[in-house]
């Protein structure tokens, strides 16, 4: 028989005291049910709200939009200066910021990041490439980076947060065939954000744990692990919130689902004013939609009040122009189109183009409001005498379709969210012909006068000049019926009742998790 060695009594007592006095802290976990898939983790490959959680939680930029109304705050940069001619922006990086592998964040990483964005020609590249040319950004020293613009741009600072900084040395290790590490970064992490990736499956979502070494000090309470999971159906997300399987989900649910969540004892609804326009883009380049009278007929065929007031219960505000009502640049005298079948038929009678085929109306899988809107549009068009064919896609797939006039549906309904708080985020990116190839510009609208006005607004730093130019451009776009603008939304964010620290911003929709914690 063998005997284990007996521990002396004092040591046993010491072990008991240590184990009872210092228990390991419980790990806190948060699961967000997202409407659309995370098909890539590359922060430079996507520029939409559906995948914003990746950019906000795994990565940092020089500045960040915070709170509501949104304010631009220093982030990786501690300060910046602008040259008198408005062309050179010089940023001083804060000391102590590190990537998830421990490497220091330097000016060279910032320079590499903007060059990578411009080279990949994805995500925010369509916007940034109008202001910055390749090989013009300089790392003056380890903590100073300078951007030289091709021309003065009033929105440059507003879009600086979209320059998400990646670990240049790490990506260079994973480059293949000069791809800037794109294949590797699709499913990996090269950031410095508040959370670091632990697991990723494009069919499911991603999991990340708290990065204790983040440059921004953590408070006494925080969430240790976050998961952003694809859950396609509204009803499944709502039921999961009620059961406690999920602790957060998107804040733009149908009114009946919001009502269900309000009645759940373990859920709270965070209400916030927002800037998010729901609209149909009309493919202006495809016959017969290249006839303005056909487009006006479509605009008169949608039952705005029936959708906004009856289906959505008055939880949104009619927005008849391509700029949110609660922002400057809006022509207040423009009332837009109303639901009027007689006027729709009159416009159709004036059209030179004949509508001799069904019109395809696209909507987004997992976003039931878009299906409801597509159905309302189809019903209205049927009363005018036009046939339709409804088609749906997951958001990333629809984005790809909307990049070309040949593949985009005749009409497609979705939201234009806030990526930066400036009218250019809406009318400039939707209706300047230089933006073709992006999902925002899927109307494929081209009007030289509108391009000229939008260029004036983009270059000027005088708010009065910009306001006047945006108003005039909006009047023309509405008269041309380039799209169908339905409403400006309000955010009704479902969160677990015991969650605190939620900092909603219309830029990101409250999906930045570093301040969030469980109250008990």
Each PLM stretch: what is its role?
Residues 493-520:
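Long beta-strand-rich cores associated with HINT superfamily self-processing modules
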Residues 33-84, 115, 190-192:
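N-terminal lobe/hinge region of extracytoplasmic solute-binding protein
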Residues 66-67, 163-220, 225, 233, ...:
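Gly/Pro-rich hinge or "lid" segments in bacterial periplasmic/extracellular proteins
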Residues 5-7, 92, 127-174, 199:
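Surface-exposed binding/hinge segments that line
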Residues 32, 102, 247-248, 253, ...:
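Periplasmic binding protein-like
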Residues 207-212, 263, 289-379, 383-384, ...:
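Append "and occasionally in soluble cytosolic enzymes with long acidic Gly/Pro-rich linkers
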Residues 213-259, 387:
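Ligand-site clamp/hinge motif
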Residues 293, 387-399, 428-496:
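Extracytoplasmic/peripheral linker and loop segments enriched in polar/acidic and small residues
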């Amino acid at each position: 028989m063998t005997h284990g060695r007996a521990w002396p009594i004092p040591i046993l007592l010491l072990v008991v005291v240590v184990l009872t006095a210092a228990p390991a802290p419980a790990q806190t976990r948060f699961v967000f049910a997202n409407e659309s898939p995370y098909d890539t983790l590359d922060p430079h490959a996507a520029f939409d709200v559906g995948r914003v959680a990746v950019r906000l939680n795994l990565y940092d930029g020089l500045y960040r939009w915070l709170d509501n109304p949104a304010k631009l705050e220093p982030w990786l940069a501690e300060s910046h200066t602008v040259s008198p001619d408005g062309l050179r922006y010089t940023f001083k990086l804060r000391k102590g910021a590190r990537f998830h592998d421990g490497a220091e964040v330097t000016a060279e990483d910032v320079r590499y990041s903007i060059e990578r964005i411009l080279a990949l020609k994805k995500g925010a590249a369509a916007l940034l490439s109008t202001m910055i040319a390749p090989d013009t950004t300089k790392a003056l020293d380890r903590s100073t980076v300078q951007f030289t613009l091709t021309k003065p741009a009033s929105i440059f600072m507003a879009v600086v947060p979209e320059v998400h900084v990646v670990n240049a040395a790490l990506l260079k290790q994973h480059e293949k065939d000069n791809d800037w590490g794109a294949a590797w970064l699709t499913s990996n992490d090269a950031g410095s954000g508040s959370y670091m990736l632990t697991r990723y499956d494009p069919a499911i979502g991603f999991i990340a744990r708290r990065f204790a070494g983040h440059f921004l000090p953590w408070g006494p309470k925080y969430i240790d692990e976050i998961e952003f999971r694809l859950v396609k159906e509204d009803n499944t997300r709502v039921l999961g919130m009620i059961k406690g399987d999920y602790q957060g989900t998107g804040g733009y649910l149908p009114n009946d689902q919001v009502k269900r969540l309000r009645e759940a004892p373990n859920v709270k609804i965070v209400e916030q004013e927002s800037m998010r326009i729901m609209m149909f883009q009309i493919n202006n380049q495809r016959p017969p939609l290249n006839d303005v009278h056909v487009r006006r007929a479509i605009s008169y065929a949608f039952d705005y009040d029936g959708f906004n007031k009856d289906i959505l219960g008055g939880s949104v505000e009619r927005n008849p122009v391509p700029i949110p009502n609660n922002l400057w640049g809006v022509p207040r005298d423009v009332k837009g189109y109303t639901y009027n079948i007689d006027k729709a038929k009159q416009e159709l009678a004036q059209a030179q183009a004949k509508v001799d085929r069904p019109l395809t109306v696209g909507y987004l899988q997992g976003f039931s409001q878009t299906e409801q809107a597509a159905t309302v549009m189809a019903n209205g068009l049927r009363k005018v005498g036009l046939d339709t064919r409804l088609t749906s896609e997951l958001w990333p797939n629809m984005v790809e379709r909307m990049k070309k006039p040949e593949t985009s549906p005749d009409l497609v309904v979705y939201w234009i969210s806030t990526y930066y708080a400036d009218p250019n985020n809406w009318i400039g990116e939707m209706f300047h012909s230089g933006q073709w190839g992006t999902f925002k510009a899927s109307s494929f609208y081209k009007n030289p006068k509108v391009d000229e006005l939008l260029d004036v607004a983009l270059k000027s730093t005088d708010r009065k000049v910009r306001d006047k130019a945006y108003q005039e451009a909006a009047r023309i776009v509405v008269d041309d019926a380039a799209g169908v603008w339905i409403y400006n939304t309000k955010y009704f964010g479902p969160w677990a009742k015991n969650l605190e620290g939620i900092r909603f911003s219309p830029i990101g929709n409250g999906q930045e998790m570093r301040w969030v914690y469980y109250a008990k």
